C-alpha cells in the first residue's frame, strides 16, 4: 500500500515525462524464418512476455510489477514495451523514474524504453488508474481477452527495420508490381551500412524474388529503401473478400553474413479506392453487407465467429475500436473487409458544443483525439482487409477535435475513405453509407 501511494505521488509530480511511442506498423521479430512463418516466439532470445504481478490496490488504483534482467548485449539494441488489453488509463515507471503515461487503454501501443533501462536487474511498475478522458471510452466494448494478454518486451538491433509500407499493385501493363518501402533505422552516433533483405512468394508458394540490398544511413537518423519488382502477369492473384489470396514475404536484416530479425508479412495484391460515394476493390464496386463485430477472446474463437458471419452473407466487419493484430491477419486470410475505427466512443452530449458538452469540440482534447487516430492508423495501415476508416462512433459528436482528426487522416491516407459518423452534414467526412 505504501509503495502504491508513493508511486501515485510520483505520477502526480512527473506526469509529463514519457517514453517515446513508436507510431509504426505493429510487428515483432523472430530469430529464424521458420519461427516467423509459424508465429513461434518460444525460441526468440530478445522477446520477453510481460507478466505483471499485482502488488497493491488503493481505491480505483492498482499497481503491478515485473522485474527483467537486461544483458550487456542489449547496449546495441533498442528495447520496446508493447502494451495491450490494459482497458484503462495507465502510467509506467522504470527503476523509479516515470517512463510513460497514457489515457488510452484500448489501442495497443509500443514504447521505446531503452533510455530508462540499465544493465542487470530492472523493475517495471505499471499503475492502472481511471483515464482523464474516460468519456471517450464510455461506448467501447471491453476486450474479451484477459488483461495484459499479448503484452511483451522486445529488443531490436540499433541498425534495423523501423517500419515498412508494402503494396502489390496492378500496372497498366497488366502485370503486378511489388512496391515495398523499408524504413531503416540507425540509432548509433555514426554512419552505418545496413543490409536489408526480403523475399516474396505467390499465393501458391512459388518464390518470385529475393534480394539483399545495402543502404548507407547516417548516425541518429532513418532512411528508406524503395524496392520495386515486376511480379509478372498474375492478375488472377488479386485479393478481394471473394478471393482472399495473399502473397507471403519475409523481411530481415543481414548482419555479419547472417540473416537476423525476421518480420513475416502477408500482402493482398490490388488496391482499395473510393469515388462517388462507393468503395472499389481493384476497380470493382464493393456491395457492403456489414455487421458490428469485435474480436473474441482468442484467434480460434474469432475465426469461428467470422466464418459464421460470412456464411450469413456478411462481408464487412465494423469493430468499435482497434483490435488485436491477429484479427486483421485473420480478416486478410479469410476474406472479409474491415471498417477500422479509432477508440473514440463517447455516449453523451453529442449535440452540445458548449463548454462541458461533447468532448469532440473541446480543444483541450485535440491532442488525445489525434493520438488515438494516429495509433489506430499506423499499426494496421498495410492490411488489405481495411477498406475505410471511421473517426469514432455515431454518438461522438462533432467539432474542433473531429475537424483536426479528419484533416490529419486525410493527409496521410490517399485512397481509402475517412468517415466521421457524427459529422451531421458538415464537411469533415467522406460521403459513404455503411
Q: What is the predicted function of each stretch?
A:
Residues 1-9, 17-325, 329-335, 387-388, ...:
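Secreted/periplasmic carbohydrate-active enzymes, especially glycoside hydrolases
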Residues 316-434:
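Substrate-binding/catalytic cleft of secreted carbohydrate-active enzymes
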Amino acid at each position: 500500500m505504501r509503495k502504491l501511494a508513493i508511486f501515485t505521488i510520483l505520477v502526480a509530480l512527473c506526469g509529463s515525462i514519457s517514453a517515446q511511442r513508436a507510431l509504426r506498423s505493429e510487428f515483432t521479430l523472430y530469430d529464424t524464418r521458420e519461427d516467423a512463418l509459424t508465429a513461434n516466439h518460444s525460441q526468440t532470445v530478445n522477446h520477453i512476455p510481460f507478466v505483471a504481478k499485482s502488488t497493491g490496490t488503493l481505491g480505483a488504483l492498482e499497481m503491478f510489477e515485473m522485474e527483467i534482467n537486461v544483458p550487456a548485449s542489449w547496449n546495441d539494441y533498442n528495447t520496446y514495451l508493447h502494451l495491450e488489453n490494459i482497458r484503462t488509463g495507465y502510467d509506467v515507471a522504470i527503476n523509479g523514474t516515470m517512463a510513460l503515461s497514457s489515457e488510452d487503454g484500448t489501442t495497443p501501443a509500443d514504447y521505446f524504453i531503452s533510455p530508462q533501462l540499465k544493465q542487470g536487474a530492472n523493475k517495471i511498475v505499471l499503475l492502472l488508474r481511471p483515464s482523464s478522458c474516460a468519456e471517450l471510452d464510455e461506448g467501447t466494448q471491453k476486450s474479451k481477452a484477459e488483461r495484459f494478454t499479448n503484452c511483451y518486451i522486445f529488443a531490436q538491433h540499433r541498425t534495423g527495420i523501423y517500419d515498412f509500407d508494402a503494396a502489390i499493385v496492378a500496372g497498366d501493363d497488366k502485370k503486378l508490381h511489388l512496391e515495398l518501402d523499408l524504413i531503416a533505422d540507425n540509432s548509433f552516433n555514426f554512419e552505418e551500412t545496413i543490409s536489408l533483405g526480403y523475399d516474396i512468394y505467390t499465393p501458391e508458394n512459388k518464390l518470385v524474388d529475393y534480394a539483399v540490398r545495402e543502404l548507407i544511413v547516417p548516425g541518429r537518423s532513418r532512411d528508406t529503401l524503395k524496392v520495386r519488382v515486376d511480379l509478372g502477369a498474375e492478375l488472377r492473384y488479386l485479393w478481394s473478400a471473394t478471393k482472399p489470396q495473399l502473397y507471403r514475404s519475409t523481411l530481415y536484416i543481414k548482419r555479419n553474413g547472417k540473416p537476423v530479425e525476421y518480420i513475416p508479412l502477408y500482402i493482398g495484391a490490388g488496391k482499395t479506392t473510393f469515388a462517388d460515394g462507393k468503395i472499389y476493390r481493384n476497380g470493382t464496386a464493393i456491395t457492403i453487407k456489414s455487421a458490428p463485430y469485435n474480436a473474441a477472446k482468442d484467434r480460434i474463437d474469432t475465426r469461428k465467429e467470422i466464418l459464421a458471419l460470412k456464411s450469413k452473407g456478411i462481408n464487412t466487419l465494423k469493430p468499435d475500436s482497434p483490435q488485436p493484430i491477429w484479427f486483421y491477419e485473420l480478416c486478410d486470410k479469410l476474406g472479409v473487409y474491415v471498417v477500422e475505427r479509432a477508440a473514440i466512443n463517447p455516449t453523451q452530449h453529442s449535440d452540445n458544443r458548449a463548454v462541458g458538452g461533447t468532448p469532440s469540440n473541446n480543444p483541450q482534447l485535440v491532442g488525445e483525439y489525434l493520438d488515438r487516430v494516429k495509433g489506430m492508423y499506423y499499426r494496421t495501415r498495410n492490411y488489405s482487409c481495411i477498406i475505410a476508416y471511421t473517426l469514432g462512433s455515431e454518438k461522438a459528436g462533432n467539432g474542433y477535435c473531429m475537424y483536426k482528426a479528419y484533416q490529419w487522416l486525410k493527409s496521410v491516407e490517399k485512397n481509402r475513405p475517412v468517415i466521421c459518423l457524427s459529422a451531421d452534414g458538415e464537411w469533415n467526412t467522406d460521403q459513404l453509407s455503411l
